[in-house]
Amino acid sequence: YWGVWHGSEPFTAYRSHHYRFLSEFGFQSFPALQTVKRFTEDGDRNIFSRVMEMHQRNTAANGKILNYISQTYLYPKNFDELLYCSQLLQADAIRYGVEHFRRFRGTCMGAVVWQLNDIWPVASWASVDYYGNWKALQYAEKKMFAPVLLSCEEHGEIDQKPFVNTLPHPIDVSADLHVANETGEPIVGTVKWSLCRPDSSVVKEGAFEVNAPAYGGQWMPHLDFNGQDPLEVHLTYELVVDGNVVSSGSTLFCAPKHYHFADPKLSVSVDGDTVTVTAENFAKSVSVETENGVLRLDDNFVDMEAGTKTFRILPTADFTAKGTGVSGAYRVRSVYETAER
């Protein structure tokens, strides 16, 4: 199914289809700036430059990425932020599909994402670039394909009024949570949810008991948030089993470009192989990077509420944690920092 991407359909279009098995679907993104620097000079770093278009197999795809960015994010303030936004788009596109297909296990019994890696440094459908750097999609796929997944089918402007200049009409602001269980044992636990404001203060919260059958799934009771401003609230959720969070996520009810983010004032510190990120407000798609782009973490490109979140550096052939506790070599960003505000 290539309606999303080649057909320029919105990500929510996946939810109109209930395939038995999906043999191929995907979405493009650019590699990180550190990879792009290896095949460009300063004057080439524009997505419509000759060099950037030559490093693109799909005709007119760079413009397609920009079109999807315009539907989702404020205009990126520079070339680097545009590359970053493209990776967030790619991860969200595939997540919309995979989570939907997993919510209807029994109808859909499998899906194959196009594609894993690249044979040259290029903008592509890959989740791992030519140099082995993980894009946002690769981190997201670790979670969306995990044996146990808590996911959310949200309803709001995203699926009912994606274009703000259409005639006013009522918007259903609600959510349906689902636990997918691909293990051979029932999953017994608790789903906890919180409806939060941009400053991470809680509007309302609740919990549901879960008993998801082996190789099956379970829908949670419908969550009705009508009366809430979709630009001012977001939903966070987690599945707790035996005291451990085994799956979690968050969702907006409008496009990120319209959400009323508060400045998260992100900061990062490093101690050995432990990276700690601090946020003063809700931050979406938080990414920690190094200047040379070879940092690999146990998780990245994550949403986080106000507070701290820790990540672990995973040593690779090009990188070891030893002697890397110099904060100046690291940077952290989120959707908030991608645009001039």
Where are these regions (language model features)?
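Substrate-binding clefts and catalytic carboxylate motifs of secreted carbohydrate-active enzymes
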Residues: 1-187, 203
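Long, low-complexity ectodomains and other extracytoplasmic segments of secretory-pathway proteins
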Residues: 143-164, 245-271
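C-terminal accessory/binding modules appended to enzymatic or scaffolding proteins
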Residues: 263-306, 312-314
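Extracellular Ig-like/FN3 beta-sandwich strand-entry sites
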Residues: 172, 188, 230-234, 308, ...
